Amino acid sequence: MPRRYLLDFEKPLVELEKQIEQIRELARDSEVDVSQQLLQLETLATRRREEIFRSLTPAQKIQVARHPQRPSTLDFIQMFCDDWIELHGDRNGGDDMALIGGLGSVNNQPVLLLGHQKGRDTKENVVRNFGMAKPGGYRKALRLMQHADRFSLPILTFIDTPGAYAGLSAEEQGQGEAIARNLREMFGFKVPIIATIIGEGGSGGALGIGVADRLLMFEHSVYTVASPEACASILWRDAAKASEAATALKITGKDLLELGVIDEVLSEPAGGNNWAPIEAGNTLKGAIEKHLNELLELKKEELLEQRYSKFRVLGKFVESNNFEEIQEQLPQITE
């Protein structure tokens, strides 16, 4: 079993983890029955972990979302797809490894699955470009989504990126155009689209595969227009104020659900998805099946209209000192 990587605010659990590991080693090396002591320590560790994660700040949630052992797109796909076949290439000479896609089935329903893919270590992260897709990645995603639309396959996307790659080469290859084209085309696909933020949902890199009929988000994932570090540097010329920026940006599932940006917050195991990835996979699969069944009942025209309306209402607001007037206008704003 790989050693668990503990975040700064999890340090109170370090001593408990050491004791649990020592007892496990004792059980392996001798015939002494330590099951009762092990159960007590594991129960105590779980309780303390729940207490810590119940009161995370937005800045701490970012650390959880970026956890190196957090389940990735491929992890989730392999958990609930036995027939996954990855498809490659943007048909323009490239095959971006930071954004993957392919065919599979969920509960016997054929689907297209695609998402950002980070690495587990430095070497793999270099290959995956730390989950930051280049223009070719978004063009590959568009090609696969067009394929899904042509063959009436629902589209499932998994978002986990700090943002689209912002290097000079990406700009030269048309990063903005590639993302903008995806946004435009996704509004016109006549198949259900479900997007899930499984880790970081950063800026245009997330939006490039995020135009969906249902947008789901794990409890400790984040969704933001810019990283808190970048926001703090821009607004206050001080990256050290990232914690304040994280709070102001409203990046958590709770905030975004209240603002109407996302449709559902998926609960995570105590300690985050990295502590119990199988449980997290079952939660995600159940949510996808529920929303997919609802969307498959809709006619194509209804699907397109609801998708358009969902995004059209974002950002609408009214200005008035008259509270009753605002209440009267709210139904019109949300229509």
Curated annotation (Swiss-Prot):
GO terms for cellular component: acetyl-CoA carboxylase complex. Keywords: ATP-binding, Cytoplasm, Fatty acid biosynthesis, Fatty acid metabolism, Lipid biosynthesis, Lipid metabolism, Nucleotide-binding, Transferase. Residues 40-294 form the CoA carboxyltransferase C-terminal domain. Pathway: Lipid metabolism; malonyl-CoA biosynthesis; malonyl-CoA from acetyl-CoA: step 1/1. Pfam families: ACCA (PF03255). It catalyses: N(6)-carboxybiotinyl-L-lysyl-[protein] + acetyl-CoA = N(6)-biotinyl-L-lysyl-[protein] + malonyl-CoA. GO terms for molecular function: acetyl-CoA carboxylase activity; ATP binding; carboxyl- or carbamoyltransferase activity. Gene3D superfamilies: 2-enoyl-CoA Hydratase, Chain A, domain 1. Component of the acetyl coenzyme A carboxylase (ACC) complex. First, biotin carboxylase catalyzes the carboxylation of biotin on its carrier protein (BCCP) and then the CO(2) group is transferred by the carboxyltransferase to acetyl-CoA to form malonyl-CoA. HAMAP family: AcetylCoA_CT_alpha. NCBIfam families: accA (TIGR00513), AccA_sub (NF041504), PRK05724.1 (NF004344). This is Acetyl-coenzyme A carboxylase carboxyl transferase subunit alpha. The gene is accA.
